[in-house]
Amino acid sequence: MATPQAPELVPAQYLLSPDAAGPRTLIDILYDTAACYPEAAAIDDGTVQLTYSELISDIEASVAWLAARGIGRGDRIGIRMPSGSFALYEAILATLAVGAAYVPVDADDPDERAELVFGEANVVAIVSEAGMARGPGSSRGWRASAPLPRDDAWIIFTSGSTGTPKGVAVTHRSAAAFVDAEAQMFLQDNMIGPGDRVLAGLSVAFDASCEEMWLAWRHGACLVPAPRSLVRSGMDLGPWLVSRDVTVVSTVPTLAALWPAEALEAVRLLIFGGEACPPELATRLAVEGREVWNTYGPTEATVVACAARLDGVGPVRIGLPLPGWDLAVVDTD
């Protein structure tokens, strides 16, 4: 058993913090991608499809609008919008681009939870389907500007061990390091890129939604949001994946187990997380031409801390740390 006082006892393959990518922000990532693939599709909700250049244009207009209303770097904005719409993701990106952190609450959650979360997070504004309203918090008074790596990107509230919501803030540096780390792991022989379509099926109040978004936007792929009602139906989502030409999916094993094999024929990257993956599911879905990964990580560790590629034959493991992460087993001392 290793302890912080005895790092030499931790095998080298579990200590990958020296492999972390250089510090940058999520907005840096988005602009780099847009510069490489300006005419590639960035988001397609079935009604509206935007290229990366169009998405950037929309975001910059929103930043000017937010700045004119006194919102700037270091502020926090509550996001409570229905899933499945490009407008939800534009609101998140505009929040990041103005230098603020987004605080998501599922649109279907009770009003009491929204009030608790937004009050605890001290949000200065709340964006909903109806528009933007004033929040319970006060602005820091800083001007709108591009975020710095040390600035918070999001604050996501978990249930906490006591059942009381607990906010976990993640900086741009940590978030971008996570995005860049996954780029070093998945589909190295034929990387994600324009032409790939990434499912956005998770609630943005769940930190794994960040993986969905940035699997697309780090690589010039297209984010394809699914309405919450469709995701909750379970089985109906399978045929929808086919109709929307989805090629990359990050989901929970319980949901994937409901889909027929043909629903995933075009999916070349399938990522599991959020719960244990049954070995029989890995055996069924880890087929030639598709990478299947099992991931694990607490919210505090920035979405995912470790991952293992599944071959459908060996045991299901949580794997080794992402590049830039360390893993250790410690005792109470």
Regions found by a protein language model. Give the residues of each.
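Carrier-protein-dependent adenylate-forming modules in NRPS/ANL systems
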Residues: 1-176, 191, 220
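Motif- and composition-driven signal specific to adenylation
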Residues: 87-89, 100-114, 141-333
